[in-house]
Amino acid sequence: MGDITVKNLSFSYGGDERLILKDINMEIEAGEFVCILGQSGCGKSTLLRLLAGLEQPTTGEILMQGVSAEGASLDKGVVFQDYGLFPWMKAGENILLALRQRFPKKDKKELKQTAVEMLEAVGLSASVYNKFPKELSGGMKQRCAIAPALSVDPPILLMDEPFGALDAVTRARLQDMLFDLWSGQASQKTVFFVTHDVDEALLLANRIVVLGQSPSNIIYECKLSDEQRPTRETRFDNLETMKLRNELIRQINKDVVTHIS
Protein backbone atom coordinates (compact mmCIF):
# COMPACT_ATOMS: atom_id res chain seq x y z
CA MET A 1 0.00 0.00 0.00
CA GLY A 2 1.25 3.49 -0.88
CA ASP A 3 1.63 6.55 1.32
CA ILE A 4 -1.66 7.90 -0.08
CA THR A 5 -4.46 5.64 -1.30
CA VAL A 6 -7.65 7.02 -2.83
CA LYS A 7 -10.42 4.49 -3.53
CA ASN A 8 -13.59 5.23 -5.53
CA LEU A 9 -13.68 8.79 -4.20
CA SER A 10 -16.64 11.03 -5.02
CA PHE A 11 -17.51 14.37 -3.44
CA SER A 12 -20.30 16.94 -3.52
CA TYR A 13 -20.78 19.98 -1.27
CA GLY A 14 -23.50 20.14 1.37
CA GLY A 15 -25.83 17.53 -0.04
CA ASP A 16 -25.71 19.12 -3.50
CA GLU A 17 -26.45 16.46 -6.09
CA ARG A 18 -23.88 17.95 -8.46
CA LEU A 19 -20.65 16.02 -8.02
CA ILE A 20 -17.32 17.87 -7.89
CA LEU A 21 -15.20 14.71 -7.94
CA LYS A 22 -16.32 11.34 -9.28
CA ASP A 23 -14.72 7.92 -8.91
CA ILE A 24 -11.15 9.07 -8.21
CA ASN A 25 -8.69 6.22 -7.74
CA MET A 26 -5.05 6.92 -7.00
CA GLU A 27 -2.08 5.24 -5.34
CA ILE A 28 0.85 7.48 -4.41
CA GLU A 29 4.03 5.76 -3.27
CA ALA A 30 6.31 7.00 -0.49
CA GLY A 31 8.76 9.59 -1.81
CA GLU A 32 6.79 10.53 -4.93
CA PHE A 33 6.39 14.18 -5.91
CA VAL A 34 2.97 14.30 -7.58
CA CYS A 35 1.68 17.44 -9.31
CA ILE A 36 -2.04 17.80 -10.02
CA LEU A 37 -3.02 19.81 -13.10
CA GLY A 38 -6.40 20.88 -14.44
CA GLN A 39 -8.58 23.84 -15.30
CA SER A 40 -9.88 26.21 -12.62
CA GLY A 41 -12.89 24.77 -10.83
CA CYS A 42 -12.15 21.15 -11.69
CA GLY A 43 -11.68 20.12 -8.06
CA LYS A 44 -7.89 20.13 -7.57
CA SER A 45 -8.03 22.10 -4.32
CA THR A 46 -11.06 20.12 -3.16
CA LEU A 47 -9.11 16.90 -3.61
CA LEU A 48 -6.24 18.32 -1.56
CA ARG A 49 -8.64 19.39 1.21
CA LEU A 50 -10.02 15.86 1.27
CA LEU A 51 -6.50 14.45 1.60
CA ALA A 52 -5.81 16.94 4.39
CA GLY A 53 -8.91 15.78 6.26
CA LEU A 54 -10.55 19.21 6.00
CA GLU A 55 -13.46 17.73 4.03
CA GLN A 56 -14.98 14.25 4.11
CA PRO A 57 -15.75 12.15 1.00
CA THR A 58 -19.35 11.73 -0.09
CA THR A 59 -18.44 8.20 -1.08
CA GLY A 60 -15.19 6.29 -1.21
CA GLU A 61 -12.14 6.19 1.02
CA ILE A 62 -8.82 7.97 1.57
CA LEU A 63 -5.98 6.27 3.43
CA MET A 64 -2.76 7.94 4.59
CA GLN A 65 -0.12 5.32 5.34
CA GLY A 66 -2.95 2.82 5.78
CA VAL A 67 -4.99 5.02 8.15
CA SER A 68 -8.23 6.82 7.27
CA ALA A 69 -7.55 10.50 6.50
CA GLU A 70 -10.03 12.08 8.89
CA GLY A 71 -9.17 15.45 10.41
CA ALA A 72 -5.86 17.26 10.77
CA SER A 73 -2.74 15.28 11.62
CA LEU A 74 0.91 16.00 12.36
CA ASP A 75 1.74 13.38 9.72
CA LYS A 76 0.44 15.78 7.05
CA GLY A 77 2.01 19.17 6.45
CA VAL A 78 -0.35 21.51 4.58
CA VAL A 79 0.63 24.72 2.75
CA PHE A 80 -1.88 27.00 1.02
CA GLN A 81 -1.45 29.94 -1.34
CA ASP A 82 -2.52 32.53 1.25
CA TYR A 83 0.49 32.09 3.58
CA GLY A 84 -1.49 30.86 6.61
CA LEU A 85 0.45 32.88 9.20
CA PHE A 86 -1.17 34.37 12.29
CA PRO A 87 -0.59 38.13 11.79
CA TRP A 88 -0.44 38.91 15.53
CA MET A 89 2.39 36.41 16.03
CA LYS A 90 6.00 36.81 14.97
CA ALA A 91 7.40 34.50 12.30
CA GLY A 92 9.23 32.39 14.87
CA GLU A 93 6.13 32.10 17.04
CA ASN A 94 4.16 30.75 14.08
CA ILE A 95 6.72 27.97 13.76
CA LEU A 96 6.79 27.35 17.53
CA LEU A 97 3.04 26.80 17.46
CA ALA A 98 3.55 23.77 15.21
CA LEU A 99 6.64 22.55 17.05
CA ARG A 100 4.87 22.50 20.43
CA GLN A 101 2.24 20.17 18.98
CA ARG A 102 4.85 17.74 17.70
CA PHE A 103 7.35 17.98 20.57
CA PRO A 104 5.38 18.86 23.74
CA LYS A 105 8.18 17.69 26.07
CA LYS A 106 10.99 19.77 24.57
CA ASP A 107 12.00 22.90 26.45
CA LYS A 108 11.47 26.42 25.08
CA LYS A 109 15.14 27.03 24.27
CA GLU A 110 15.42 23.84 22.23
CA LEU A 111 12.20 24.58 20.35
CA LYS A 112 13.36 28.10 19.54
CA GLN A 113 16.64 26.76 18.15
CA THR A 114 14.70 24.33 15.96
CA ALA A 115 12.49 27.19 14.72
CA VAL A 116 15.56 29.23 13.77
CA GLU A 117 17.01 26.21 11.95
CA MET A 118 13.77 25.83 9.99
CA LEU A 119 13.87 29.48 8.93
CA GLU A 120 17.41 28.94 7.69
CA ALA A 121 16.35 25.73 5.92
CA VAL A 122 13.87 27.71 3.82
CA GLY A 123 16.43 30.38 3.01
CA LEU A 124 15.70 33.00 5.67
CA SER A 125 18.03 34.51 8.25
CA ALA A 126 17.64 34.04 12.00
CA SER A 127 16.65 37.72 12.31
CA VAL A 128 13.30 36.94 10.63
CA TYR A 129 12.32 35.04 13.80
CA ASN A 130 11.31 38.30 15.52
CA LYS A 131 9.50 39.90 12.58
CA PHE A 132 5.74 40.06 12.17
CA PRO A 133 4.22 38.87 8.86
CA LYS A 134 3.35 42.46 7.88
CA GLU A 135 7.09 43.25 7.90
CA LEU A 136 7.89 40.54 5.35
CA SER A 137 7.71 40.44 1.55
CA GLY A 138 5.40 37.98 -0.20
CA GLY A 139 8.24 35.55 -0.85
CA MET A 140 9.42 35.72 2.76
CA LYS A 141 5.88 35.13 4.02
CA GLN A 142 5.55 32.03 1.88
CA ARG A 143 8.89 30.69 3.08
CA CYS A 144 7.66 31.27 6.63
CA ALA A 145 4.42 29.43 5.79
CA ILE A 146 6.38 26.43 4.52
CA ALA A 147 8.64 26.33 7.59
CA PRO A 148 5.94 25.22 10.12
CA ALA A 149 4.79 22.48 7.76
CA LEU A 150 8.35 21.17 7.50
CA SER A 151 9.23 21.73 11.17
CA VAL A 152 7.10 18.82 12.41
CA ASP A 153 8.84 16.57 9.86
CA PRO A 154 5.68 15.11 8.30
CA PRO A 155 6.12 12.19 5.89
CA ILE A 156 3.43 13.72 3.64
CA LEU A 157 3.36 17.32 2.38
CA LEU A 158 0.20 18.74 0.77
CA MET A 159 0.64 22.02 -1.13
CA ASP A 160 -2.16 23.99 -2.80
CA GLU A 161 -0.66 26.42 -5.35
CA PRO A 162 1.80 27.72 -2.75
CA PHE A 163 3.66 29.93 -5.24
CA GLY A 164 0.72 31.07 -7.36
CA ALA A 165 0.56 34.65 -6.02
CA LEU A 166 4.30 35.37 -6.23
CA ASP A 167 6.28 37.23 -8.88
CA ALA A 168 8.23 35.14 -11.41
CA VAL A 169 11.67 35.55 -9.81
CA THR A 170 10.50 34.75 -6.27
CA ARG A 171 8.43 31.86 -7.57
CA ALA A 172 11.45 30.34 -9.32
CA ARG A 173 13.56 30.64 -6.18
CA LEU A 174 10.94 28.93 -4.03
CA GLN A 175 10.42 26.18 -6.62
CA ASP A 176 14.15 25.48 -6.53
CA MET A 177 14.16 25.59 -2.72
CA LEU A 178 11.28 23.11 -2.48
CA PHE A 179 12.83 20.74 -5.00
CA ASP A 180 16.20 20.86 -3.22
CA LEU A 181 14.54 20.20 0.15
CA TRP A 182 12.61 17.25 -1.29
CA SER A 183 15.40 15.67 -3.34
CA GLY A 184 18.13 16.29 -0.76
CA GLN A 185 16.59 14.19 1.99
CA ALA A 186 17.75 10.65 2.67
CA SER A 187 14.10 9.71 3.22
CA GLN A 188 12.14 11.75 0.72
CA LYS A 189 8.78 13.15 1.71
CA THR A 190 5.70 12.35 -0.32
CA VAL A 191 4.52 15.60 -1.93
CA PHE A 192 1.04 16.26 -3.36
CA PHE A 193 1.24 19.60 -5.17
CA VAL A 194 -1.67 21.41 -6.84
CA THR A 195 -0.81 23.83 -9.66
CA HIS A 196 -2.25 25.46 -12.80
CA ASP A 197 1.23 25.73 -14.31
CA VAL A 198 2.37 22.95 -16.66
CA ASP A 199 5.98 24.19 -16.57
CA GLU A 200 5.98 24.17 -12.77
CA ALA A 201 4.73 20.58 -12.78
CA LEU A 202 7.44 19.51 -15.23
CA LEU A 203 10.18 21.13 -13.12
CA LEU A 204 9.09 19.64 -9.81
CA ALA A 205 7.22 16.38 -10.26
CA ASN A 206 8.24 12.83 -10.94
CA ARG A 207 4.56 12.10 -11.62
CA ILE A 208 1.90 14.36 -13.14
CA VAL A 209 -1.86 13.79 -12.92
CA VAL A 210 -4.46 15.73 -14.95
CA LEU A 211 -8.02 16.13 -13.67
CA GLY A 212 -10.86 16.69 -16.13
CA GLN A 213 -13.76 19.11 -15.80
CA SER A 214 -16.31 18.69 -13.01
CA PRO A 215 -17.39 16.10 -12.11
CA SER A 216 -13.67 15.43 -12.20
CA ASN A 217 -11.83 12.22 -12.59
CA ILE A 218 -8.31 11.43 -13.75
CA ILE A 219 -8.05 11.82 -17.53
CA TYR A 220 -4.27 11.54 -17.95
CA GLU A 221 -1.13 10.81 -15.96
CA CYS A 222 2.55 10.22 -16.61
CA LYS A 223 5.75 9.51 -14.71
CA LEU A 224 9.08 11.27 -15.23
CA SER A 225 12.45 9.72 -14.54
CA ASP A 226 15.28 11.88 -13.19
CA GLU A 227 16.68 11.95 -16.73
CA GLN A 228 13.36 13.09 -18.21
CA ARG A 229 12.72 15.87 -15.70
CA PRO A 230 14.01 19.12 -17.22
CA THR A 231 16.14 21.70 -15.48
CA ARG A 232 15.18 25.37 -15.57
CA GLU A 233 17.95 25.98 -18.12
CA THR A 234 17.21 23.04 -20.45
CA ARG A 235 13.43 22.70 -20.32
CA PHE A 236 12.86 24.27 -23.75
CA ASP A 237 15.82 22.51 -25.40
CA ASN A 238 14.70 18.92 -24.82
CA LEU A 239 12.40 17.62 -27.57
CA GLU A 240 10.86 14.91 -25.36
CA THR A 241 10.10 17.45 -22.65
CA MET A 242 8.40 19.75 -25.16
CA LYS A 243 6.34 16.84 -26.52
CA LEU A 244 5.17 16.01 -23.01
CA ARG A 245 4.45 19.68 -22.28
CA ASN A 246 2.30 19.93 -25.41
CA GLU A 247 0.49 16.70 -24.53
CA LEU A 248 -0.33 17.94 -21.03
CA ILE A 249 -1.72 21.19 -22.44
CA ARG A 250 -3.69 19.23 -25.05
CA GLN A 251 -5.22 16.98 -22.41
CA ILE A 252 -6.30 19.92 -20.25
CA ASN A 253 -7.75 21.89 -23.17
CA LYS A 254 -9.32 18.85 -24.84
CA ASP A 255 -11.53 18.27 -21.84
CA VAL A 256 -12.58 21.93 -21.79
CA VAL A 257 -13.59 21.79 -25.46
CA THR A 258 -15.54 18.59 -24.84
CA HIS A 259 -17.55 20.20 -22.02
CA ILE A 260 -18.23 23.39 -24.00
CA SER A 261 -19.46 21.50 -27.04
Which positions does each model-derived feature cover?
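The feature captures the beta-strand-to-loop junction immediately N-terminal to the Walker
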Residues: 37-39
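Helix-to-loop junction immediately C-terminal to a conserved catalytic motif
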Residues: 52
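Conserved ABC transporter NBD signature motif
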Residues: 60-72
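Conserved ABC ATPase "signature" region
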Residues: 107-127, 179-180
